[in-house]
């Protein structure tokens, strides 16, 4: 999920601003979602996701990708030969784009934090990348994920860092001359660990990735080095690995 980083950028480009819910936002974004060559968040999140994925067994297992979007991580997942891969997203247009890339993909349209099309204890691995903060209730979402996860299974989460939200960063994209801001809900990392523990999960790994020299060229291309200097060192994304004993 692309996030332009700073509130002022829309004003600088003369764009109006509109705040929308996740379904409307990603439906509107779907047609251009895959064209994000200079996205700072994705530049930091993608290698972190690969690090998380290397910690779990994919081959022969059932994987559920919650907030799958257009299937950004699917080439990496499918290269490790899962027994099945299910894409879940609340946006019908995003799922249409996923189907365009993977015509045989099994998909399910999420209903808020509910996954009615997925049976109890039917998955070995749940992946959620840059999606959880779009759900108003993290506790109910993680509880539902635990419902569909088998014992011995794992959950991998990446998301926009709550500290970045507190620093004024937003999840936005540009469409029709407007800056579209997609609603999101920050959950502190300690609170997220507590929720997971209450749901019967065990945290085994966590990491953060901050704005650093590796993404400086992206700020340079956007002619936004002042923002880079201001926010250098700010954690922008985090990743967590939980297991269900």
Residue ranges and their predicted role:
Residues 116-126:
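A short acidic, Gly/Pro-enriched loop at the edge of an enzyme's catalytic core
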Residues 125-138:
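A short SAM/SAH-binding and catalytic strip from SAM-dependent methyltransferases
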Residues 2-57, 72-76, 94-97, 156-179, 183, 210, ...:
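Conserved class I S-adenosyl-L-methionine
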Residues 139-151:
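A short glycine-rich, Lys/Arg-flanked "PGG" loop and its adjoining helix->strand segment in the class I
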Residues 64-66, 70-114:
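Class I SAM-dependent methyltransferase SAM/SAH-binding core
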Residues 184-206:
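Short alpha-helix
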Residues 203-245:
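A C-terminal cap/extension of S-adenosyl-L-methionine-dependent methyltransferases
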């Amino acid at each position: 999920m692309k996030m332009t980083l700073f509130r002022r950028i829309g004003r600088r480009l003369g764009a109006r601003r509109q705040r929308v819910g996740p379904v409307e936002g990603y439906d509107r974004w779907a047609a251009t979602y895959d064209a994000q060559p200079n996205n700072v968040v994705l530049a930091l999140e993608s290698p972190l996701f690969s690090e998380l994925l290397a910690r779990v067994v994919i081959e022969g297992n059932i994987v559920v990708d919650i907030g799958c979007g257009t299937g950004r991580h699917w080439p990496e997942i499918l290269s490790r030969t899962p027994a099945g891969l299910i894409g879940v997203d609340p946006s019908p247009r995003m799922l249409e784009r996923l189907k365009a890339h993977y015509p045989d993909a099994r998909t399910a349209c999420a209903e808020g934090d509910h996954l009615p099309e997925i049976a109890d204890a039917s998955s070995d691995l749940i992946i959620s990348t840059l999606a959880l903060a779009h759900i108003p209730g993290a506790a109910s979402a993680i509880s539902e994920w635990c419902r569909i996860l088998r014992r011995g299974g794992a959950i991998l989460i990446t998301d926009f860092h709550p500290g970045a939200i507190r620093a004024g960063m937003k999840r936005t994209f540009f469409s029709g001359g407007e800056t579209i801001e997609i609603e999101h809900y920050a959950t502190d990392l300690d609170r997220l660990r507590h929720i997971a523990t209450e749901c019967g999960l065990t945290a085994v790994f966590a990491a953060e990735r901050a704005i650093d020299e590796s993404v400086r060229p992206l700020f340079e291309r956007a002619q936004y080095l002042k923002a880079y200097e201001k926010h250098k060192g700010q954690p922008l994304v985090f990743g967590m690995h939980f297991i269900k004993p």
